[in-house]
Amino acid sequence: MGMTMTQKILAAHAGLEAVKAGQLIEANLDLVLGNDITTPVAVNEFKKFGTDKVFSKSQIAIVPDHFTPNKDIKAAEQVKYIREFAQNMEIENFFEVGEMGIEHCLLPEKGLVVAGDVVIGADSHTCTYGALGAFSTGIGSTDMAAGMATGKCWFKVPSALKFVLKNKPAKWISGKDIILHIIGMIGVDGALYKSMEFVGDGLQYLSMDDRFTMANMAIEAGGKNGIFPVDDKTEEYLKDHASREWKVYEADEDAEYDKVFEIDLSELRPTVSFPHLPDNTRTIDNTGDVAIDQVVIGSCTNGRISDLRMARDILKGKKVKKGIRCIVIPGTQKIYLQAIKEGIVTDLVEAGAAFSTPTCGPCLGGHMGILAKGERCVSTTNRNFVGRMGHVESEVYLASPAVAAASALTGKITDPELV
């Protein structure tokens, strides 16, 4: 039996000719990632190894993004601690405020992840880089520490689910709608410890930003990783961004999949995930009359330039409904600058939105838009658990930038076609 794309990448990095689902392996790492929340714990564990150096100064990335710019004294102390560690270890890829971005937007932009890589990150949405044809997955701070010390990590080789995407997406359908549809279909544990492998002729219509969004939310279905084959769009992106050579892996024709799903993108409708799990989805036609208090457009899921363009296209020349808060957060400084050059920032601010420096901020209930008791938010983020963005009695509705922007105009969950 042949191997899936994920299995081929893992086999190569383990120095093996072949692997099979369930097999335990030790693989060489191309990149180890941490942020301001997870890295302090990893540093504490790293110090127990008794080594005075990391395995590679260039293959570790530390991105303070969750509580930055520092939201309080504790946040400042955490970043100071990991900044000093990075300086002492001469880690090349420590990204300070002013040069940083949300980690999963920043690393592809900097070319630090390329096709064929094996990447671990002490953040669950590290699976984002599967959009580039890499195997990337979230791990805990202890594994991050071991990775920084040894350049290796152990894995159980995952089995796979295959998603065959067919036809051109219907109007307003983005990567966010597709992945919410999939999660709603299979459930938050539907891909538990499996690779989610996306294929099909529908890929030609999906931008890299769409793919980043979809791979990002593989974890919300329980997936070990999400991954896309390398095609012309991937190659074009890598040529523009990659800092080193990449390698293309393709699934064998006789690769084994636990299940194959066919999805006709032309039949999808904008999709919203209701509280309090990402799989509690409804199409925009079945959302009912849900009044909201806040809209957030941004995050590692939807903070890229195409997302901001979509929000601008809907909000330009209009006004956010009185009493509604609309917060827009670009994924990186480069995206921020591009939004300035294109007039997006001006258009959004004139519409009544607040525009922020890059940060994870409200996504995890950190800062920059916390919800009070009883408040509702339409957000382009990736999780809507109880208390995720603030008070335990607040509610988060996950949606695309188009639905979020339309909802900001009306003060309720709204089909973008209607504004």
UniProtKB/Swiss-Prot annotation:
NCBIfam families per the record?
A: hacA_fam, IPMI_arch, LEU2, PRK00402.1
Name a biological process GO annotation.
Answer: L-leucine biosynthetic process
Entry EC number(s): 4.2.1.33
Query: Which PANTHER family does this UniProt record tie to the protein?
Result: 3-ISOPROPYLMALATE DEHYDRATASE LARGE SUBUNIT 2, HOMOACONITASE, MITOCHONDRIAL-RELATED
Species of origin reads Clostridium beijerinckii (strain ATCC 51743 / NCIMB 8052)
Instruction: Identify the cofactor(s).
Output: [4Fe-4S] cluster
Substrates-to-products reaction catalysed: (2R,3S)-3-isopropylmalate = (2S)-2-isopropylmalate
Q: What is this protein called?
A: 3-isopropylmalate dehydratase large subunit
Keyword Membrane part of the UniProt annotation: no
Provide the family line.
Belongs to the aconitase/IPM isomerase family. LeuC type 2 subfamily.
**What does the record give as its pathway?**
Amino-acid biosynthesis; L-leucine biosynthesis; L-leucine from 3-methyl-2-oxobutanoate: step 2/4
Query: Quaternary structure per UniProt?
Result: Heterodimer of LeuC and LeuD.
The function of this protein is:
Catalyzes the isomerization between 2-isopropylmalate and 3-isopropylmalate, via the formation of 2-isopropylmaleate.
Q: Which domain of life is it from?
A: Bacteria
UniProt keyword annotations, A-Z: 4Fe-4S, Amino-acid biosynthesis, Branched-chain amino acid biosynthesis, Iron, Iron-sulfur, Leucine biosynthesis, Lyase, Metal-binding
